[in-house]
Amino acid sequence: MELKELIAKAKEKEVKAMEELFIRFTPLLKSRAKRYSGYGLEYDDIFQQAALLFIIAVYDYEERPSTSFAGYIKKRIDWGLWVYYRKYLKQKIEISYGLKIGN
């Protein structure tokens, strides 16, 4: 099935289409999880977070001539995992030093 068609069907909550998209993009999710696991995060936790970000990104995706689906997914996952990592660091600092940072 063509990528455009898979995206449209996945957005209509068709499980098989979402599964196929997920399978196609699993190498990206794994590479991003591996990158962040090098910063002290658990690989499985990061991969699950990346999977959740992927599903949300599929639902949010709007086709535009200037943005490919793969590029959009990569940016959304990178940004989402960066935010997740920052929250992890904040929590680690608070626990280590007994501090309350921010709100």
Predicted regions and their residues:
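Alpha-helical promoter-recognition and RNA polymerase-docking modules of transcription initiation factors
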Residues: 1-91
